[in-house]
Amino acid sequence: MAGKRQSQDPVNAIKVVASTMLNSFLEDLKEKNVLNKQELQTMGQTVNVITKKTENLVGDLTEKTQVVGKIFKDHFLNSGSLLSLKSHAENEDECSESSSAVLQEIQASQVKVRKLCPCDHSHEPKITNVHEIYPVMEKEGRTRLALIICNSEFDYLSKRQGSEIDILGMQDLLENLGYSVVVKENLSALEMKTELKNFAARQEHKFSDSTFLVFMSHGTLDGICGTKHRNEEPDILHDDTIFQIFNNRNCRSLKDKPKVIIMQACRGRGDGAVWVTDVGEASAWTCDQPLQCYIFNDAIEKTHVEKDFIAFKSSTPHNVSWRLNTDGSLFISHLIHYFREFSCCHHLEEIFRKVQNSFETPNTMIQMPTIERVSMTRYFYLFPGN
């Protein structure tokens, strides 16, 4: 069988397929009275040239009618199936039973690849398996929602000047990514919780493939500050509250769909910097007590309570996040820039890492964004324009 494969010239095999396609194509033109006899004879004389140099085919037909274009399109697309079938036929002794299934899988993959957004950047989406990415719904009939909560006015804390720039920037970004954006401003922790519950209950999520939750406010290590916050009486929206409202137990409409949380807020008063020498000693935390693990399972249905989340925060724990009264927050401005630059060809976590990399070299305003509480099981590509 190996000798049979070597004796067959693959170039000639492709020419045979191309010639067969063209002959069938010309017959259809004749039957439908698109070309007369003289024109058919003229085209017939060029078949050999077309077979050897197929890129001239389109040029030979551009002056014909739309009917010619439609017939050619049908035959040209079917040629991919002919080539695929011929390739599988060479191994029919070894895998005749599975060839049709493999072909169907390849064709299904090709259909999905055609739906990817065109990327003006030099890199194409690096997708090796369509099952490794979150499904993206068709634009028609899809109802993506995003929520922005921004607190700029507080009863006891300073005004967050420049926050209006962050709102406009994030709203424009998310709308261009296909999300209808809900904006809420100046809420207490209780009011934020109420708005989150209302947003989680929106019926549009049933016909959506993902959601974004954006929080911009003063903050502490414990969470996002509400408008009534002060040291004596904390007004804090905790991370756990957000995750609980949108987990699979309480928000079924977003089950198995990416839920992206973005937080612009301080997480302490530290500046996030330390002076180090070129050579240092590292210390490790130790514990005298042995690690004990107890596993319990209270779930009623066979699904993870918390899954498909990712949180991107503007700074590391205990440290500040910087904001300019004229340009808005550094984190938000960098985030918007890299989303616009790379969302067509990189998945979400890669974009987040590019934002982190932009903060890698410390300068006057030091902060390091962090990716936290990740439970996403696939790559999330945004495919802008789709």
Swiss-Prot record:
Signal peptide: none annotated. It comes from Canis lupus familiaris (Dog). This is Caspase-12. Gene3D superfamilies: 3.40.50.1460, Caspase-like. Belongs to the peptidase C14A family. The keyword Protease applies. The modification Phosphoserine is found at residue 84. One of its GO terms (molecular function) is cysteine-type endopeptidase activity. Its EC number is 3.4.22.-.
